[in-house]
Structure formats: structure tokens, C-alpha cells
Amino acid sequence: MKSAVITFPGSNCDRDMDVALKKFGFKNKMVWHQDFELPKSDLVVLPGGFSYGDYLRCGSMASKSKIMQSVINFANSGGMVMGICNGFQILVETGLVPGVLLRNKYLEFILSLIHI
């Protein structure tokens, strides 16, 4: 299988993801956020980190990166896309994952289990 890991300014663990995917037999390509086209892939991964800084909705800036239209087209055509941590936030900001990211009522970290 072929995969692509998208790297944004502030991404971390993108290289770890590259190593892990290769360990499991993927032929992985690292893709810079300013690229326009994805390489032929079966899986696209948006890793964690702090794209454009450690702020609420920092994924909103990353969602406007040049590569994201190709990621959206890939997902809409049935391609597998995985977002980890900030990568998930980017997917929410693009509209590929429904929902919105908001500050909570108390402006504090809350950890609780939820059932989806």
C-alpha cells in the first residue's frame, strides 16, 4: 500500500509516522503543505503538532494550505484519511469531519469519557 504524510509548519511526529508506516509495509511519501498534488496513495495522514502555533483553531490556517484541496478531493472520492491530534482538528476545519472546535465554558482542560 502507498501512503502520504502531510507536514505543516509546527507538525511533530510526522517523521515517526513515516517510520511506523514503512515498518508496516507502506511505501510512504512525505508531502509539504505547500505542494498542490498528493502522490498516488491509499492512505493520507495528517499528523499531530501545532500547525501555525499552539492556539485554538490553529487547524483553520492549515485547512487553507495548498495541499488540502487535494486531500479533500481524495477523501470525497473514497480515499482513507487519518488525522491525529492537530491533524484531526484540521479535518474538522476543512469540513471533512463534522463539528466545530470551541472553547469550553470554564476555559479549562476537561477529561471525560463520552459515548459516540
PLM region spans:
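N-terminal beta1-alpha1 cap of cysteine-dependent amidohydrolase-like domains
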Residues: M1-I84, L91-P98, L102, E108-L113
